């Protein structure tokens, strides 16, 4: 019984810390006039941190996942609002990836970054601008794949692209018009990468 109470207290403390950090994140996003639903970041970080704690307990993996979630959340909201993402977000993602590199995973992580980054560079160079892949998408996705490694990074990237295609088809069908403007890709890729982190 005391063990259960300890685990429950640790879980609640983890979620509470995530929600406090979310408050500061939301204040910053509001100050920069980003468009977002005010309660949604709290739901996402609260549920996300709870799920990470349930899967990993009080561990470096859990806290790395929460930091990963915060970077992706901020990048997604900024991309949705301005079609840009600050360079510092890629640097933060790179720092998370570097802290995760070990001798056993280095090759997988570098391969994941090379494949995801290379695939996006090809799409950006060969495709049309309206496909939605820009420099911020490439930098953040490449560093996310470096953090996740080959298997999880590629799966996360492919899932994110699939979600983006399906969502844009639904949006285009509902509006009954051909979409010519680029759309924010990072929110979709973020969902894929979070799923990749959890598997």
Per-range role (PLM):
Residues 1-199:
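A membrane-topology feature that recognizes alpha-helical transmembrane segments
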């Amino acid at each position: 019984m005391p063990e259960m109470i300890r685990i429950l207290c640790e879980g609640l403390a983890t979620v509470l810390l995530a929600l406090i950090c979310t408050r500061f994140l939301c204040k910053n996003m509001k100050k920069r006039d980003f468009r977002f639903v005010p309660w949604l970041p709290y739901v996402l970080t609260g549920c996300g941190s709870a799920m990470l704690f349930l899967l990993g307990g009080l561990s470096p993996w859990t806290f790395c996942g929460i930091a990963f979630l915060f970077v992706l959340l901020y990048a997604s909201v900024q991309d949705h609002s301005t079609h840009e993402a600050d360079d510092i977000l890629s640097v933060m993602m790179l720092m998370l990836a570097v802290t995760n590199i070990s001798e056993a995973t280095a090759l997988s992580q570098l391969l994941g970054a090379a494949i995801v980054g290379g695939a996006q560079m090809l799409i950006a160079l060969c495709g049309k601008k309206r496909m939605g892949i820009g420099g911020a998408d490439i930098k953040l996705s490449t560093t996310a794949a470096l953090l996740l490694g080959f298997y999880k990074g590629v799966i996360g990237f492919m899932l994110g692209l699939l979600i983006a295609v399906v969502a844009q088809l639904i949006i285009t069908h509902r509006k009954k018009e051909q979409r010519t403007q680029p759309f924010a890709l990072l929110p979709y890729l973020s969902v894929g990468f979070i799923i990749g982190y959890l598997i």
